[in-house]
A protein has these predicted regions:
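Hydrophobic, aromatic-enriched alpha-helical segments typical of multi-pass transmembrane helices
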Residues: 2, 8-255
Length: 256
């Protein structure tokens, strides 16, 4: 009787753990959907530098490496750019929760803790980096219709905004990518609750496939939209696959 009670307790505890893990992974799914839509609205445009010679030629020396960005932002209306930010910033907390889910997928240890830390750090930085596209893009729009005397001040403001955007965006993406790399390594080493084949669903290889595929169609609006959301689309694929694996394997889950 005692053995039956102990087995029942272990079974209930395992079911609770699986339910909690599934909930965290679903938070990642919802966040990835929100951020994918936001990316498509914010940067999912085909580059048309020939339509904006002021930015792509005349002011290009002053804009430097940000000239292409300034041109890209002209394709979206202010309302579209705004809605390209809101779904992402208001769902960022779900990505933070999903980072705990990724941590619980890995076998406890130093690698799992480091992976969680860098993933959480990257997600925490991401709203500022993402919102920076809106503010910098709006300055780029003002540049297009400004009078000559306003150029120096507007160009200086644009460069300051772009620098802030670049620092936070690169730090966020780099940190998140490092977290996914650690998970990829652990998956291949069979030190996660996922099968080794799930390495193909990791955002790094999935994102590479999406980016390369979209680059083959530079004038396609669909490719531009998908390419602009590459990283979040890749994370959506992962969280869906991980949630499916957890649900399928259920209480019998073992690392690798």
């Amino acid at each position: 009787m005692q053995n039956q009670n102990e087995a029942s307790v272990r079974c209930g505890s395992s079911e609770t753990a699986v339910s909690r893990l599934s909930l965290l992974l679903w938070a990642g799914i919802v966040a990835a959907v929100c951020w994918t839509v936001a990316d498509m609205l914010l940067v999912g445009f085909v580059q048309t530098p020939e339509r904006y010679p002021l930015l792509s030629q005349t002011l290009a020396p002053q804009l430097g490496e940000a000239a292409d960005f300034a041109v890209l932002m002209q394709a979206g209306s202010p309302e579209r750019l705004l809605w390209g930010v809101l779904p992402a910033t208001f769902s960022a907390a779900l990505y933070l929760a999903a980072a705990f889910g990724v941590y619980r997928l890995m076998r406890p240890g130093r690698t799992a803790r480091v992976g969680f830390a860098v993933l959480f750090f990257g997600y925490a930085l991401s709203p500022l980096g993402h919102a920076g596209f809106y503010f910098t893009g709006m300055v780029a729009k003002v540049l297009l219709n400004a009078v000559l005397d306003d150029y120096p001040a507007l160009l200086a403001l644009f460069r300051h905004f772009y620098r802030m955007l670049a620092v936070h965006w690169m730090a966020s993406v780099g940190s998140i990518a490092a977290g996914w790399l650690l998970l990829l390594i652990q998956t291949l080493r069979r030190r996660t609750l996922l099968p080794r084949a799930a390495a193909w669903c990791n955002p790094l290889p999935v994102g590479t496939v999406i980016a390369v595929s979209c680059s083959l169609f530079p004038q396609s609006p669909v490719a531009a939209a998908l390419g602009g959301a590459t990283f979040n689309l890749a994370q959506l694929v992962f969280f869906v696959c991980a949630a499916a694996c957890v649900r399928r394997r259920g209480m019998g889950m073992q690392p690798g």
